Amino acid sequence: MGTVNSLEAGIDEAGRGPVIGPMVIAIVGWSNSEAEGIGVKDSKQLTPSGRSRLYKLIVSKAPCVRHVIVEPSEIDYYVNRGLLNELEAIKMSELIKACSGVTRVYVDSPDPNPSRFRGFINVKDVELIVLNHADESIPLVSAASIVAKVIRDTIISRLKETYGDFGSGYPSDPRTISALRRWINNGTLPPIVRRSWRTIKRMTNSRLF
Protein backbone atom coordinates (compact mmCIF):
# COMPACT_ATOMS: atom_id res chain seq x y z
CA MET A 1 0.00 0.00 0.00
CA GLY A 2 1.37 3.38 -0.95
CA THR A 3 0.86 6.81 0.49
CA VAL A 4 -0.74 9.93 -0.87
CA ASN A 5 -0.29 13.60 -0.15
CA SER A 6 -3.38 13.97 2.02
CA LEU A 7 -5.47 11.40 3.83
CA GLU A 8 -8.26 11.22 6.33
CA ALA A 9 -8.06 8.39 8.82
CA GLY A 10 -10.11 6.60 11.44
CA ILE A 11 -8.87 4.87 14.59
CA ASP A 12 -10.59 2.34 16.82
CA GLU A 13 -9.77 -0.57 19.10
CA ALA A 14 -10.99 -4.07 19.75
CA GLY A 15 -10.63 -5.90 23.04
CA ARG A 16 -10.48 -3.14 25.62
CA GLY A 17 -12.85 -4.90 28.02
CA PRO A 18 -11.92 -8.61 28.03
CA VAL A 19 -10.01 -10.17 30.90
CA ILE A 20 -8.21 -12.48 28.46
CA GLY A 21 -6.14 -11.61 25.41
CA PRO A 22 -4.60 -8.49 23.89
CA MET A 23 -6.16 -5.25 22.78
CA VAL A 24 -5.74 -4.36 19.12
CA ILE A 25 -5.83 -0.76 17.89
CA ALA A 26 -6.05 -0.02 14.17
CA ILE A 27 -5.91 2.97 11.86
CA VAL A 28 -7.31 3.17 8.33
CA GLY A 29 -6.19 6.06 6.13
CA TRP A 30 -8.53 6.54 3.18
CA SER A 31 -11.70 8.61 2.71
CA ASN A 32 -15.08 8.34 4.38
CA SER A 33 -16.86 8.25 1.03
CA GLU A 34 -14.78 5.34 -0.27
CA ALA A 35 -15.12 3.41 2.99
CA GLU A 36 -18.86 3.95 2.91
CA GLY A 37 -18.89 2.91 -0.75
CA ILE A 38 -17.76 -0.64 0.03
CA GLY A 39 -20.44 -1.02 2.70
CA VAL A 40 -18.39 -0.43 5.82
CA LYS A 41 -20.35 -0.34 9.06
CA ASP A 42 -19.65 -0.79 12.76
CA SER A 43 -17.94 -4.17 13.23
CA LYS A 44 -20.30 -5.11 16.06
CA GLN A 45 -23.19 -5.07 13.56
CA LEU A 46 -21.47 -7.51 11.19
CA THR A 47 -21.23 -11.28 11.08
CA PRO A 48 -17.72 -12.79 11.20
CA SER A 49 -17.92 -13.56 7.48
CA GLY A 50 -19.08 -10.01 6.74
CA ARG A 51 -16.19 -8.58 8.74
CA SER A 52 -13.72 -10.85 6.95
CA ARG A 53 -15.01 -9.80 3.53
CA LEU A 54 -14.81 -6.10 4.35
CA TYR A 55 -11.40 -6.53 6.01
CA LYS A 56 -9.97 -7.91 2.77
CA LEU A 57 -11.46 -5.02 0.79
CA ILE A 58 -10.15 -2.41 3.23
CA VAL A 59 -6.63 -3.85 3.24
CA SER A 60 -6.54 -4.08 -0.55
CA LYS A 61 -7.95 -0.61 -1.26
CA ALA A 62 -7.00 1.77 1.58
CA PRO A 63 -3.63 3.56 1.15
CA CYS A 64 -2.79 3.10 4.83
CA VAL A 65 -3.82 0.29 7.17
CA ARG A 66 -1.80 -0.22 10.34
CA HIS A 67 -2.39 -1.86 13.69
CA VAL A 68 -0.71 -2.38 17.03
CA ILE A 69 -1.16 -5.29 19.44
CA VAL A 70 -1.16 -4.35 23.12
CA GLU A 71 -0.34 -7.38 25.26
CA PRO A 72 -1.93 -8.07 28.67
CA SER A 73 1.32 -7.34 30.54
CA GLU A 74 1.47 -3.81 29.12
CA ILE A 75 -2.24 -3.30 29.75
CA ASP A 76 -1.74 -4.39 33.37
CA TYR A 77 1.12 -1.95 33.86
CA TYR A 78 -1.04 1.00 32.84
CA VAL A 79 -4.29 -0.17 34.46
CA ASN A 80 -2.52 -0.58 37.81
CA ARG A 81 -1.59 3.09 37.54
CA GLY A 82 -5.04 4.21 36.37
CA LEU A 83 -3.71 5.09 32.92
CA LEU A 84 -5.53 2.83 30.45
CA ASN A 85 -6.82 5.78 28.41
CA GLU A 86 -3.33 7.24 28.27
CA LEU A 87 -2.01 3.90 27.00
CA GLU A 88 -4.55 3.92 24.19
CA ALA A 89 -3.62 7.50 23.33
CA ILE A 90 0.09 6.60 23.16
CA LYS A 91 -0.61 3.75 20.76
CA MET A 92 -2.96 5.88 18.68
CA SER A 93 -0.31 8.59 18.42
CA GLU A 94 2.16 6.01 17.11
CA LEU A 95 -0.32 4.81 14.51
CA ILE A 96 -1.11 8.32 13.30
CA LYS A 97 2.60 9.01 12.85
CA ALA A 98 2.97 5.72 10.96
CA CYS A 99 0.31 6.73 8.41
CA SER A 100 2.19 9.11 6.14
CA GLY A 101 0.15 11.96 4.72
CA VAL A 102 -2.70 11.87 7.23
CA THR A 103 -4.05 15.35 7.90
CA ARG A 104 -7.36 14.60 9.66
CA VAL A 105 -8.07 11.74 12.05
CA TYR A 106 -11.39 10.60 13.48
CA VAL A 107 -10.95 8.89 16.84
CA ASP A 108 -13.42 6.74 18.76
CA SER A 109 -12.91 8.04 22.29
CA PRO A 110 -12.84 5.48 25.13
CA ASP A 111 -13.23 8.39 27.55
CA PRO A 112 -16.75 9.79 28.13
CA ASN A 113 -15.07 13.20 27.86
CA PRO A 114 -13.70 13.25 24.28
CA SER A 115 -11.92 16.58 24.70
CA ARG A 116 -9.97 15.20 27.65
CA PHE A 117 -8.92 12.15 25.64
CA ARG A 118 -7.94 14.38 22.73
CA GLY A 119 -5.41 16.03 25.02
CA PHE A 120 -3.63 12.71 25.54
CA ILE A 121 -2.93 12.20 21.82
CA ASN A 122 0.51 13.56 20.97
CA VAL A 123 0.64 14.47 17.28
CA LYS A 124 1.38 17.65 15.37
CA ASP A 125 -0.13 19.15 12.22
CA VAL A 126 -3.08 16.77 12.29
CA GLU A 127 -6.71 17.72 12.83
CA LEU A 128 -8.15 15.44 15.50
CA ILE A 129 -11.89 14.83 15.64
CA VAL A 130 -12.51 12.82 18.80
CA LEU A 131 -16.01 11.47 19.37
CA ASN A 132 -17.83 8.94 21.49
CA HIS A 133 -19.32 6.06 19.48
CA ALA A 134 -17.56 7.28 16.34
CA ASP A 135 -17.59 3.71 15.02
CA GLU A 136 -21.36 4.04 14.62
CA SER A 137 -21.30 7.21 12.53
CA ILE A 138 -17.90 7.67 10.83
CA PRO A 139 -17.14 5.13 8.06
CA LEU A 140 -13.36 5.35 8.50
CA VAL A 141 -13.67 4.59 12.20
CA SER A 142 -15.96 1.69 11.34
CA ALA A 143 -13.27 0.46 8.94
CA ALA A 144 -10.64 0.66 11.69
CA SER A 145 -13.01 -1.19 14.00
CA ILE A 146 -13.34 -3.98 11.44
CA VAL A 147 -9.58 -4.27 11.00
CA ALA A 148 -8.95 -4.35 14.75
CA LYS A 149 -11.72 -6.88 15.37
CA VAL A 150 -10.65 -9.30 12.61
CA ILE A 151 -7.01 -9.22 13.73
CA ARG A 152 -7.95 -9.74 17.38
CA ASP A 153 -10.33 -12.58 16.56
CA THR A 154 -7.52 -14.30 14.65
CA ILE A 155 -5.21 -13.93 17.64
CA ILE A 156 -7.86 -15.28 20.01
CA SER A 157 -8.41 -18.34 17.81
CA ARG A 158 -4.68 -19.09 17.92
CA LEU A 159 -4.55 -18.62 21.68
CA LYS A 160 -7.34 -21.16 22.10
CA GLU A 161 -5.26 -23.70 20.21
CA THR A 162 -2.63 -23.31 22.93
CA TYR A 163 -4.69 -22.70 26.07
CA GLY A 164 -8.00 -24.40 25.29
CA ASP A 165 -11.44 -22.86 24.97
CA PHE A 166 -11.91 -19.82 27.21
CA GLY A 167 -15.02 -18.41 25.55
CA SER A 168 -15.16 -14.79 24.51
CA GLY A 169 -12.64 -13.63 27.12
CA TYR A 170 -15.17 -11.24 28.66
CA PRO A 171 -15.89 -11.43 32.41
CA SER A 172 -19.61 -11.87 31.69
CA ASP A 173 -19.00 -15.14 29.81
CA PRO A 174 -19.43 -18.30 31.97
CA ARG A 175 -16.92 -20.15 29.76
CA THR A 176 -14.35 -17.45 30.47
CA ILE A 177 -14.98 -17.63 34.20
CA SER A 178 -14.71 -21.42 34.07
CA ALA A 179 -11.32 -21.21 32.34
CA LEU A 180 -10.08 -18.62 34.82
CA ARG A 181 -11.23 -20.77 37.74
CA ARG A 182 -9.42 -23.78 36.28
CA TRP A 183 -6.18 -21.85 35.85
CA ILE A 184 -6.39 -20.34 39.33
CA ASN A 185 -7.05 -23.74 40.90
CA ASN A 186 -4.04 -25.12 39.03
CA GLY A 187 -1.94 -22.35 40.53
CA THR A 188 -0.89 -20.65 37.30
CA LEU A 189 -2.48 -17.85 35.32
CA PRO A 190 -1.18 -17.86 31.74
CA PRO A 191 0.30 -14.64 30.30
CA ILE A 192 -2.83 -14.09 28.20
CA VAL A 193 -4.76 -13.08 31.36
CA ARG A 194 -5.04 -9.45 32.46
CA ARG A 195 -4.18 -9.74 36.13
CA SER A 196 -5.17 -6.13 36.82
CA TRP A 197 -8.84 -6.82 36.10
CA ARG A 198 -11.19 -6.79 39.11
CA THR A 199 -12.50 -10.20 38.03
CA ILE A 200 -9.10 -11.76 38.68
CA LYS A 201 -8.59 -9.95 41.96
CA ARG A 202 -12.00 -11.09 43.20
CA MET A 203 -11.40 -14.69 42.16
CA THR A 204 -7.91 -14.94 43.61
CA ASN A 205 -9.06 -13.37 46.90
CA SER A 206 -12.18 -15.52 47.18
CA ARG A 207 -12.53 -19.02 48.63
CA LEU A 208 -15.76 -19.62 46.74
CA PHE A 209 -14.16 -21.19 43.71
UniProtKB/Swiss-Prot annotation:
InterPro entries: RNase_H2_suA, RNase_HII/HIII, RNase_HII/HIII_dom, RNase_HII_arc, RNase_HII_hlx-loop-hlx_cap_dom, RNaseH-like_sf, RNaseH_sf. This is Ribonuclease HII. Its EC number is 3.1.26.4. Pfam families: RNase_HII. Its cofactor is Mn(2+); Mg(2+). Residues 6-209 form the RNase H type-2 domain. PROSITE patterns: RNASE_H_2. A divalent metal cation binds at D12, E13, D108. It catalyses: Endonucleolytic cleavage to 5'-phosphomonoester. GO terms for biological process: DNA replication, removal of RNA primer; mismatch repair. It comes from Caldivirga maquilingensis (strain ATCC 700844 / DSM 13496 / JCM 10307 / IC-167).
